[in-house]
């Protein structure tokens, strides 16, 4: 909910509320995941916890960052293409970029856009000022749309946790698995 809200709000107070909701949700995700793993697979110990945490962090770094960047480029370019075709033609990149199995997209040329954004607003011609405003607006809207689409990932995880909840209720409730006792009655 918080991530979706971050992609939908524009005022400072609303951003603070959305970030707080996102932070609360994020606070419960990692501990819940690690608690379930440690209680359901106690023999795995620290190695299992480390592997699960490592896979999560690798996924976030190798898939999350580039995936969000791809979506931001895609949606930003679509906004410019639909609303300002002339600006699109001037600032579109010659290189198409893809991500995993998603279609390739032409992002905006970062070098050209960077030169425009680096100029002092008082030095801009009226055309450049209009282009700058359009590109900044498209970038913000593209980033917000990318965040809203990214919210599907934690939504999928939330649904998965609900499925686990129903599964454990059907089994008579959630119980941590105990390590088997050794012959002398001590836990291994």
Q: What residue ranges belong to the model's regions?
A:
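Intracellular juxtamembrane helix-capping segments at the cytosolic ends
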Residues: 28-41, 48
């Amino acid at each position: 909910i918080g991530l979706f809200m971050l992609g939908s709000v524009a005022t400072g107070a609303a951003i603070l509320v959305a970030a707080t909701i996102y932070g609360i949700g994020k606070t419960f995700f990692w501990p819940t995941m690690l608690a379930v793993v440690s209680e359901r697979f106690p023999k795995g110990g620290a190695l299992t916890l480390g592997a699960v945490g490592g896979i999560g962090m690798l996924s976030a770094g190798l898939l999350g960052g580039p995936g969000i960047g791809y979506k931001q480029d895609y949606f930003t370019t679509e906004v410019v293409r639909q609303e300002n075709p002339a600006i699109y033609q001037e600032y579109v990149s010659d290189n198409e970029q893809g991500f995993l199995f998603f279609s390739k997209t032409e992002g905006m040329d970062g070098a050209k856009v960077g030169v425009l954004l680096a100029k002092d607003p008082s030095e801009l011609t009226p055309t450049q000022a209009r282009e700058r405003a359009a590109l900044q607006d498209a970038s913000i809207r593209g980033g917000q749309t990318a965040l809203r689409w990214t919210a599907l990932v934690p939504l999928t995880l939330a649904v998965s946790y609900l499925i686990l909840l129903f599964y454990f209720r059907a089994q008579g409730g959630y119980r941590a698995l105990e390590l088997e006792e050794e012959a002398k009655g001590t836990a291994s």
